[in-house]
């Protein structure tokens, strides 16, 4: 295992499972000073274990990459927590960012987010607006959210304001050992972001800094019912406003009975690119 004695701006945490083309696509979109960040890839039991040779076939060798191998497929929550625990042991970064295989960043994403957190010490967690795109049909829609902390806190009762691959948060916000909760299957990020917001403010940069791949085999589609049930549990546990909590749970239960293709059509008609 490498050691990273010098201070860096951020670690970029990416879970990986049998998707080398998607991983390389994502890594090629990252633009930042190579000396100031490290990519941490957690291979969640791929059929062919990921190697540094695989990664460096597609990106510059100047970029620092750490691959953590899990012996078998443990699921995204375990993969993410394994990565976070490794990062915590290093103790040499100001921030942690996320990206998923297949998603891509605007050239200034990380420069903007690092600067934002440096300039706003009360903010623990920053995300951005994003575009969801189906690369097979080229259908796309915008994901637009409130940007200021007070409205974010209210809106979190109804949906996860922070799209996972868009976020960056302070390393120091996890000093109590916070990890992704394993009690909310397919919505671990929702619970994790609520934990971070208990310790500081959240913010959204109102620009499309990430394009997220719509994966019709992914969690959000194939396990939608389980995800919605987990989101209900998150709102019940973390929501602090009784009225908003009730309304948020009502909305999520309504989504349980609406077919996803109807939801997708509505999103496309309202927010289509």
Explain the meaning of each model-derived region.
Residues 108-141:
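Conserved donor NDP-sugar-binding/catalytic core segment of glycosyltransferases
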Residues 70-90:
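Glycine-rich, basic loop-to-helix element that forms the pyrophosphate-binding segment
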Residues 43-54, 72, 100:
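A conserved acidic beta->alpha catalytic loop
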Residues 28-37:
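Short, acidic, metal-binding catalytic loop of nucleotide-sugar glycosyltransferases
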């Amino acid at each position: 295992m490498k050691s990273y004695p010098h201070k860096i701006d951020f670690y970029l945490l990416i879970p990986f499972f049998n998707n080398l083309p998607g991983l390389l696509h994502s890594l090629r979109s990252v633009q930042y000073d190579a000396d100031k960040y490290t990519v941490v890839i957690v291979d969640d039991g791929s059929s062919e274990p990921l190697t540094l040779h695989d990664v460096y076939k597609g990106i510059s060798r100047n970029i620092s990459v750490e691959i953590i191998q899990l012996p078998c497929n443990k699921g995204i929550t375990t993969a993410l927590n394994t990565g976070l625990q490794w990062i915590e042991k290093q103790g040499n970064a100001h921030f942690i960012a996320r990206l998923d295989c297949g998603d891509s960043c605007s050239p200034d994403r990380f420069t903007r987010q690092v600067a934002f957190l440096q300039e706003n010490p009360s903010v623990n967690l920053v995300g951005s607006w994003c575009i969801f795109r189906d690369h097979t049909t080229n259908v796309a829609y915008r994901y637009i959210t409130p940007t200021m902390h007070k409205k974010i806190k209210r809106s979190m009762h109804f949906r996860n304001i922070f799209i996972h691959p868009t976020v960056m948060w302070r390393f120091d916000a996890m000093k109590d050992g916070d990890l992704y909760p394993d009690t909310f299957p397919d919505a671990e990020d929702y619970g994790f972001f609520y934990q971070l917001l208990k310790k500081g403010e959240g913010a959204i940069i109102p620009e499309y800094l990430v394009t997220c791949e719509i994966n019709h085999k992914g969690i959000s589609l194939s396990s939608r019912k389980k995800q919605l049930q987990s989101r209900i549990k998150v709102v019940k546990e973390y929501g602090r406003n009784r009225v908003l909590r009730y309304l948020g749970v009502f909305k999520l239960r309504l989504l349980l009975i609406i077919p996803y293709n109807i939801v997708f059509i509505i999103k496309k008609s309202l927010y289509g690119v």
